[in-house]
Amino acid sequence: MLGYLSDGLRFLSFEGSWSLKPHEALTLNAALAWLPGDLENTARKQIAQRFFVERMSGGRVPCFRYYRMDPGLKIEGPLGSGDHFINVVLKIGRRRLNAKCVLHDGVVFGLEFPKPGSFFKNADIEVGSVSCDETAFSYTAVLDRAEHGIDSGD
């Protein structure tokens, strides 16, 4: 109950919603379509669960907060543990921007964009390419290090 109240306050302060914005949906669908068939089906079942999109950093980092994730919907295999990033190149006119879909411990965790959400409003966006990006830089990794410190295993 408190989760819904908290999400309602975020909604009223324009920091989140219960639905994806068009550029978020385009990026997420492109990333999930890149996954092999069985993993794509599992990931799509995850995002069919009820969730709230919490947007941080001006909409650059939308994170999915699931209310009740079915434990049987975790992605298995190499993408089932740790952080993985599916890189989606978005074409907006002549510009190319790299967005990411973040998988964390087998769950579709959120998205990352290099520009604030307002940049994408009313923009004509196409998907250029999709690949799995295992680079160390991501907004999610920066936030994780800020909260938990640097992992001594790296």
Question: What is each PLM-predicted segment?
Answer:
Residues 1-83, 124-154:
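N-terminal domain-onset segments
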Residues 66-119:
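Amphipathic protein-protein interaction modules
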